[in-house]
Swiss-Prot record:
Gene3D superfamilies assigned to the protein according to its UniProt record, in alphabetical order: Ribosomal protein L33 (2.20.28.120)
Domain of life according to the entry: Bacteria
Family, as annotated: Belongs to the bacterial ribosomal protein bL33 family.
Keyword DNA damage attributed: no
Family annotation (InterPro entries): Ribosomal_bL33, Ribosomal_bL33_CS, Ribosomal_bL33_sf, Ribosomal_zn-bd
BP term (GO), one: translation
Keyword Ribonucleoprotein: yes
HAMAP family: Ribosomal_bL33
Keywords linked to the UniProt accession: Ribonucleoprotein, Ribosomal protein
GO CC aspect terms: cytosolic large ribosomal subunit
Protein name: Large ribosomal subunit protein bL33
């Protein structure tokens, strides 16, 4: 079977709280690292989340 085009990634908060989201991304359309603003419930604000590897 062919390997899927989507990889599982972890989006980790840049606020230093340790909070993270998991999602998938298409590695062909977006080969660079993803950075997106999302809500961090620990600091109760919208902060930037950056892509890290799932261990």
């Amino acid at each position: 079977m062919a390997k899927g085009a989507r990889d599982k990634i972890k989006l980790e908060s840049t606020a230093g709280t340790g909070h993270f989201y998991t999602t998938t991304k298409n590695k062909r359309n977006m080969p660079e690292k993803m950075a997106i603003k999302k809500f961090d419930p620990v600091v109760r604000k919208r902060v930037e989340y950056k892509e890290t590897k799932i261990k």
